[in-house]
Amino acid sequence: MQKYTSEARQLLALRIPVILAQVAQTAMGFVDTVMAGGYSATDMAAVAIGTSIWLPAILFGHGLLLALTPVIAQLNGSGRRERIAHQVRQGFWLAGFVSVLVMIVLWNAGYIIRSMHNIDPALADKAVGYLRALLWGAPGYLFFQVARNQCEGLAKTKPGMVMGFLGLLVNIPVNYIFIYGHFGMPELGGIGCGVATAAVYWVMFIAMLSYIKHARSMRDIRNEKGFGKPDSVVMKRLIQLGLPIALALFFEVTLFAVVALLVSPLGIVDVAGHQIALNFSSLMFVLPMSLAAAVTIRVGYRLGQGSTLDAQTAARTGLGVGICMAVVTAIFTVTLRKHIALLYNDNPEVVALAAQLMLLAAVYQISDSIQVIGSGILRGYKDTRSIFFITFTAYWVLGLPSGYILALTDLVVDRMGPAGFWMGFIIGLTSAAVLMMLRMRYLQRQPSAIILQRAAR
């Protein structure tokens, strides 16, 4: 019991800064929306449309680079810290290549925006302008993620938190300057949010790079002169590990986007109630997501030390803590669902629907916690390909079709409306949780030599 208690303390120490870093990141998006809305409703809508395209594109690159965390954690645990610098440099090369692809996609996103049904031309122009300003921040964001993953792989999660709040503090005044045109800068409205956010990502990267260069705990890692050439072998391995994670993230983001599109014809009340429940459940998701990041670090580190039993302890402790947290947040959601809905909207019909959907959200919080922590465990074991197959099967083969049938057809029961899609979420997330646990159990039953061999690749 003592080893589980000790492991829980380690996990909580790692996850709290990750939570706060995510809060800072979410707050930046909130600030952009509010400040653009203060300028005009059109500018706020433009930022919202632009963000809906930016997120899938940049999260694909973000997911690809998540492969660095277990690689660095494993090297750190095995005492091969001299190899970390080379891995990080290849991470920067990979981030640079991905940045070019993301920027090309975002530059041409105007074709997607202008093809939207009945979109106002002025709104479309502002959304395109916002994206074309924001895309210059893509390299800064991805370079920052490489540096952050280096720190987190070394079990140092506080720098990411500090840089997140630094970015938030810089974002507010720079937004103000470019939205309203102060200090000789042009008045750009919502497009100014894109300029400010792009600048903030570069500030965060430069600040994180400065920390890494001067941190005493990383002196032994700075052992290569010059930046070095791309290493095709290392980059191929990072892509093999990271691409399934990137695709899994992409499938998850696009699933919720597709459901939002399917709900939109059902009416204003249904759309508003769905959006309230989804926004609140997204806030609750920060808790298990941060724990999953901590579990990846601990499992990778323990495997690097050559201890498969300690890796199992880290995995089981993470699941136990995650389930306990999910039960608490589910009770909180059920108890206060009407009060929470009233914080978003005071329309009685919207509040009633949102409260009903939050009951379903409370049910899936436990499954959601298990599946995201399970994904973190599998990343720690460097078994990322299974994450892709599980996510695709659970969300797109089981969850979305069943949600569509329940919500919009009479094949099984009378049309359920938005609640049908939430039943689909429950089916998809529960399926993912079960499949993640089965895969974890299969991996942990393999001989230690095979587990350690995979982890060392």
From Swiss-Prot:
<feature type="transmembrane region" description="Helical">
    <location>
        <begin position="127"/>
        <end position="147"/>
    </location>
</feature>
<dbReference type="GO" id="GO:0015297">
    <property type="term" value="F:antiporter activity"/>
</dbReference>
<feature type="topological domain" description="Extracellular">
    <location>
        <begin position="264"/>
        <end position="275"/>
    </location>
</feature>
<keyword id="KW-0472">Membrane</keyword>
<feature type="topological domain" description="Extracellular">
    <location>
        <begin position="408"/>
        <end position="417"/>
    </location>
</feature>
<keyword id="KW-0997">Cell inner membrane</keyword>
<feature type="transmembrane region" description="Helical">
    <location>
        <begin position="53"/>
        <end position="73"/>
    </location>
</feature>
<feature type="topological domain" description="Cytoplasmic">
    <location>
        <begin position="74"/>
        <end position="92"/>
    </location>
</feature>
<keyword id="KW-0812">Transmembrane</keyword>
<comment type="similarity">
    <text>Belongs to the multi antimicrobial extrusion (MATE) (TC 2.A.66.1) family. MdtK subfamily.</text>
</comment>
<dbReference type="GO" id="GO:0046677">
    <property type="term" value="P:response to antibiotic"/>
</dbReference>
<feature type="transmembrane region" description="Helical">
    <location>
        <begin position="93"/>
        <end position="113"/>
    </location>
</feature>
<dbReference type="GO" id="GO:0005886">
    <property type="term" value="C:plasma membrane"/>
</dbReference>
<feature type="transmembrane region" description="Helical">
    <location>
        <begin position="314"/>
        <end position="334"/>
    </location>
</feature>
<comment type="function">
    <text>Multidrug efflux pump that functions probably as a Na(+)/drug antiporter.</text>
</comment>
<feature type="topological domain" description="Cytoplasmic">
    <location>
        <begin position="297"/>
        <end position="313"/>
    </location>
</feature>
<feature type="transmembrane region" description="Helical">
    <location>
        <begin position="243"/>
        <end position="263"/>
    </location>
</feature>
<dbReference type="Pfam" id="PF01554">
    <property type="entry name" value="MatE"/>
</dbReference>
<feature type="topological domain" description="Cytoplasmic">
    <location>
        <begin position="439"/>
        <end position="457"/>
    </location>
</feature>
<dbReference type="GO" id="GO:0006814">
    <property type="term" value="P:sodium ion transport"/>
</dbReference>
<feature type="transmembrane region" description="Helical">
    <location>
        <begin position="350"/>
        <end position="370"/>
    </location>
</feature>
<keyword id="KW-0050">Antiport</keyword>
<feature type="topological domain" description="Cytoplasmic">
    <location>
        <begin position="1"/>
        <end position="15"/>
    </location>
</feature>
<feature type="transmembrane region" description="Helical">
    <location>
        <begin position="276"/>
        <end position="296"/>
    </location>
</feature>
<feature type="transmembrane region" description="Helical">
    <location>
        <begin position="160"/>
        <end position="180"/>
    </location>
</feature>
<keyword id="KW-0739">Sodium transport</keyword>
<keyword id="KW-1003">Cell membrane</keyword>
<feature type="topological domain" description="Extracellular">
    <location>
        <begin position="181"/>
        <end position="187"/>
    </location>
</feature>
<feature type="transmembrane region" description="Helical">
    <location>
        <begin position="16"/>
        <end position="36"/>
    </location>
</feature>
<feature type="transmembrane region" description="Helical">
    <location>
        <begin position="387"/>
        <end position="407"/>
    </location>
</feature>
<protein>
    <recommendedName>
        <fullName>Multidrug resistance protein MdtK</fullName>
    </recommendedName>
</protein>
<dbReference type="InterPro" id="IPR050222">
    <property type="entry name" value="MATE_MdtK"/>
</dbReference>
<keyword id="KW-0813">Transport</keyword>
<keyword id="KW-1133">Transmembrane helix</keyword>
<dbReference type="GO" id="GO:0006855">
    <property type="term" value="P:xenobiotic transmembrane transport"/>
</dbReference>
<dbReference type="GO" id="GO:0016020">
    <property type="term" value="C:membrane"/>
</dbReference>
<feature type="topological domain" description="Cytoplasmic">
    <location>
        <begin position="371"/>
        <end position="386"/>
    </location>
</feature>
<feature type="topological domain" description="Extracellular">
    <location>
        <begin position="37"/>
        <end position="52"/>
    </location>
</feature>
<feature type="transmembrane region" description="Helical">
    <location>
        <begin position="188"/>
        <end position="208"/>
    </location>
</feature>
<dbReference type="InterPro" id="IPR002528">
    <property type="entry name" value="MATE_fam"/>
</dbReference>
<feature type="topological domain" description="Cytoplasmic">
    <location>
        <begin position="209"/>
        <end position="242"/>
    </location>
</feature>
<dbReference type="GO" id="GO:0042910">
    <property type="term" value="F:xenobiotic transmembrane transporter activity"/>
</dbReference>
